[in-house]
């Protein structure tokens, strides 16, 4: 049976009982207090208020800056083309600095003082879980754009990043077939790493593979000497790495120095988020495999246009355009499309539009919001880095639905309100 953890704020009854029923050339990037569009939260201002909390400093800024840049680009493009329903977006984007307490404080401020029409917030799962109880308490539309460990079934939260059944379930069996059944996992010691590791355990058991070792590394730790010794002692066929943040990234150079270049690696985060294949000296990432929904190297006309616009806008400030940045970009257009379909920024009606199987033309390809679970389908490609850190898209798996919440715990937010995170344990 799936294990269930709950965020505060949602009780029993139909979900509609709990939803709100309130009657320029560039984005306005601000952190001051102001109103929002009259038919949304009812402040009377003729702008759409978009709250954005992305880490532009601190432990997770490497990816947070990408996300902030991509969302700013989307807002600017939308405003340059007439806004949404003729209204410009005002993007209110204070820096949470990768600190959980700041996420709590700033979320309350954006919701209660700035009265945003929509909230985007968070890189780390710990920050998402700090925000969700506040979102549910205030019945606030919240879009979380990160790849994550999955399992959130929440009436007010829409998760637009990839989840384990899209990244692990289709990829790990291929690696086991090619390299062998013995797997060693090292993961960040918080909810993302712990739950994603449990996904690897679940899939490994289903395919007859073995988890021969598992370690959880506290955030901020950068010395992996004992971990590398343990890996060498177990001699696995595959190493799963679920490491997060600037300090934990030191593992890859230490692994290279220990002579483990030939050990195949599986992950859900590297290259697509932190562009380690660009930042680290070869062959630190050699034989890294990951199922990605997006990397800037995807060679399609649509994506090449997106990449060109991104670098034209940000110039030397832009170092890479990763999957989380792409998610933030298309999720801004997803909100635009939902508001236009609803004909209003009223959050109840925007949620109904998002739950209508809404589709979006993302840089990765055409994808769709799953109404019952509030998660996106994604186009998944298998990527491998060679000894020189050249990447190869070895297989296009096509569009994969976020099926586990429906088929496992039975999440159906059209029928039953919820605020839980379920785990495959």
Model-derived segments and spans:
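Extracytoplasmic ligand/sensor domains, especially the bilobed periplasmic-binding protein
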Residues: 101, 105, 112-215, 263-289
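N-terminal Sec signal peptide cleavage junction
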Residues: 35-36
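Short, well-structured alpha-helical segments in soluble
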Residues: 97-116, 223-235
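N-terminal secretory signal peptides
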Residues: 1-13
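Extracellular/periplasmic periplasmic-binding protein-like sensory domains
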Residues: 255-329, 406-412, 418-424
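Signal peptide-proximal N-terminal region
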Residues: 69-91, 206-209
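Segments of small-molecule ligand-sensing domains
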Residues: 315-322, 336-400
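Extracytoplasmic "Venus flytrap"
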Residues: 47-70, 94-100, 123-124, 187-194, ...
């Amino acid at each position: 049976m799936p294990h269930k953890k709950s965020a505060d704020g949602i009780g029993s009854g139909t979900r509609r009982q709990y939803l709100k029923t309130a009657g320029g050339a560039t984005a306005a990037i601000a952190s001051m207090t102001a109103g929002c569009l009259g038919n949304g939260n009812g402040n009377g201002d003729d702008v759409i208020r978009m709250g954005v909390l992305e880490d532009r400093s601190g432990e997770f800024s490497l990816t947070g800056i990408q996300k902030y840049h991509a969302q700013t680009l989307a807002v600017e493009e939308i405003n340059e083309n007439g806004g949404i329903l003729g209204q410009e977006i005002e993007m209110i984007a204070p820096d949470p600095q990768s600190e959980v307490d700041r996420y709590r404080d700033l979320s309350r401020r954006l919701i209660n003082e700035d009265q945003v029409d929509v909230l985007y917030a968070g890189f780390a799962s710990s920050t998402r879980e700090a925000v969700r109880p506040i979102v549910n308490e205030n019945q606030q539309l919240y879009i979380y754009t990160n790849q994550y460990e999955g399992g959130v079934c929440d009436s007010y939260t829409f998760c637009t990043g990839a989840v384990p059944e899209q990244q692990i379930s289709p990829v790990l069996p291929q690696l086991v077939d090619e390299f062998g059944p013995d797997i060693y996992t090292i993961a960040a010691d918080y909810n993302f790493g712990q739950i994603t590791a449990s996904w690897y355990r679940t899939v490994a058991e289903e395919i007859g593979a073995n988890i021969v070792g598992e370690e959880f590394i506290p955030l901020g730790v950068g010395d992996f000497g004992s971990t590398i010794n343990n890996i060498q002692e177990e001699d696995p066929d595959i190493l799963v790495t679920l490491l997060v943040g600037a300090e934990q990234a030191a593992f890859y150079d230490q692994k290279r120095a220990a002579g483990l270049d030939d050990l195949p690696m599986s992950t859900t985060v590297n290259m697509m988020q932190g562009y380690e294949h660009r930042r680290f000296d070869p062959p630190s990432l050699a034989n890294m495999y990951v199922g990605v929904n997006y990397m800037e190297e995807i060679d399609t006309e649509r994506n090449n246009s997106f990449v060109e616009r991104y670098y034209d806008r940000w110039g030397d400030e832009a170092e890479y355009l990763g999957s989380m940045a792409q998610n933030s970009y298309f999720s801004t257009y997803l909100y635009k499309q939902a508001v236009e379909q609803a004909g209003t920024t009223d959050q109840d009606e925007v949620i109904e539009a998002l739950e209508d199987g809404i589709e979006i033309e993302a840089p990765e390809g055409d994808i769709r919001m799953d109404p019952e679970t509030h998660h996106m389908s994604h186009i998944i490609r298998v990527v491998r880095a060679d000894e020189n850190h050249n990447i190869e898209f070895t297989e296009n798996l096509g569009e994969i639905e976020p099926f586990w919440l429906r088929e496992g715990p039975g999440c159906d937010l059209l029928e039953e309100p919820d605020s839980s995170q379920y785990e495959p344990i």
